[in-house]
């Protein structure tokens, strides 16, 4: 006797086995799931894979999404502990990593996350050798270097989420101060995604009018309007959210999805993301920091050489030195 499916449906052509635009998110914690839902709501992928070592948490999160399939345009969501589920991904987003425990040094946390990357990256590359990898796990700049080293991928294919969010916070806060939508506020935060990030005040502009031309002291200690507090709010913003709700998730997820769209849709938009800066601004070490990068299907296709003033360049090099002093002691 025929099954209900056999009586109802007549097949005309075989299904395509391979997705055209598959994204994998590694890590189903708060950031990973915020990235997943943001990607799904933007309709960036025709297949989304979730990978995590915690099978119960993974299954629960995946089922919760699958039960909402009717409301999503992504036809396929898969999940598993094994990296075979990520096979043939165009983009792999790594959000998994250890959290700092009380009394732990930054270097000790970093070393634990290096161990995590050593466990994650080989499985990713084995199943998706031509993928682009985006690192979100902190400290993102050094871990982008680590993933580049472990993966063997070209530098253009390994991208850190970097200062894309810092720059977005910067533009939002400038907009709040001026009463202008952040999309019309143009400015960059570069260097480390963290305390030593560098606001490029010399280039901040609205409709081509640089704020420095109106206030030459902008961003400095002598600025009577104290615009430098804007950058302080950028640096403190993540900590404030962390203290209030226990973690950050939505802003970083929206930032990650914005970067992913530029890569997967070949948009050639410019983002402040983490990449190799050796050879720029006199830097001789293999350091990864955020600079403006053009993103497309090949990953990072071009670098934008920012004309920093003397003070900004000095701060950028200081940011580089801070990271190098940590990175040089890493055991890979």
Curated annotation (Swiss-Prot):
Q: Which family does it belong to?
A: Belongs to the LDH/MDH superfamily. LDH family.
The residues that the entry says bind NAD(+) are: 29-57, 99, 138
| Main localisation | cytoplasm
Question: Would you name any one GO CC term?
Answer: cilium
Q: Which InterPro entries match?
A: L-lactate/malate_DH, L-lactate_DH, L-lactate_DH_AS, Lactate/malate_DH_C, Lactate/malate_DH_N, Lactate_DH/Glyco_Ohase_4_C, NAD(P)-bd_dom_sf
User: Where does the record place it?
Assistant: Cytoplasm
Keyword Cell inner membrane: yes or no? Answer: no
Q: Which catalytic residues are annotated?
A: 193
The record's note on quaternary structure and interaction partners says: Homotetramer. Interacts with RABL2/RABL2A; binds preferentially to GTP-bound RABL2.
What EC number(s) would the UniProt record show? 1.1.1.27
> What does the record give as its pathway?
Fermentation; pyruvate fermentation to lactate; (S)-lactate from pyruvate: step 1/1
Give the record's keywords alphabetically: Cytoplasm, NAD, Oxidoreductase
One GO BP annotation here?
pyruvate metabolic process
A molecular function GO annotation: L-lactate dehydrogenase activity
Q: Give binding positions for substrate.
A: 106, 138, 169, 248
Free-text function comment from the UniProt entry:
Possible role in sperm motility.
- This chain's protein is named L-lactate dehydrogenase C chain
Extract the PROSITE patterns matched here.
L_LDH (PS00064)
């Amino acid at each position: 006797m025929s099954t209900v499916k056999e009586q109802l449906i007549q097949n005309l052509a075989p299904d395509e086995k391979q997705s055209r635009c598959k994204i994998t998110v590694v890590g189903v914690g708060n950031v990973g799931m915020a990235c997943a839902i943001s990607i799904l709501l933007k309709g960036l992928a025709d297949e989304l894979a979730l990978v995590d070592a915690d099978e119960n948490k993974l299954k629960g999160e995946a089922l919760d999404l699958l039960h909402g399939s009717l409301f999503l345009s992504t036809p396929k969501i898969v999940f598993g502990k094994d990296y075979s589920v990520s096979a043939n991904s165009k983009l792999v987003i790594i959000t998994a990593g250890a959290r700092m425990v009380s009394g732990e040094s930054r270097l000790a946390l970093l070393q634990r996350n290096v161990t995590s990357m050593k466990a994650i990256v080989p499985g990713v590359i084995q199943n998706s050798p031509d993928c682009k990898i985006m690192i979100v796990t902190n400290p993102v700049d050094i871990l982008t270097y680590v993933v580049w080293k472990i993966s063997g991928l070209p530098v253009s294919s390994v991208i850190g989420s970097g200062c894309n969010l810092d720059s977005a916070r910067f533009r939002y806060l400038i907009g709040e101060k001026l009463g202008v939508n952040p999309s019309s506020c143009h400015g960059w935060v570069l260097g480390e995604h963290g305390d030593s990030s560098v606001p490029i005040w010399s280039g901040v502009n609205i409709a081509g009018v640089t704020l420095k031309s109106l206030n030459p002291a902008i961003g400095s200690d002598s600025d009577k309007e104290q615009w430098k507090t804007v950058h302080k709010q950028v640096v403190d913003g993540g900590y404030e959210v962390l203290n209030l709700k226990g973690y950050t998730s939505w802003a970083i997820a929206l930032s990650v999805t914005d970067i992913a769209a530029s890569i997967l849709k070949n948009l050639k938009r410019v983002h402040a993301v983490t990449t190799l800066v050796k050879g720029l601004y006199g830097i001789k070490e293999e350091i990864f920091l955020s600079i403006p990068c053009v993103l497309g299907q090949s990953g990072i296709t071009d670098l934008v050489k920012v004309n920093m003033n003397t003070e900004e360049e000095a701060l950028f090099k200081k940011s580089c030195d801070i990271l190098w002093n940590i990175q040089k002691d890493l055991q890979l």
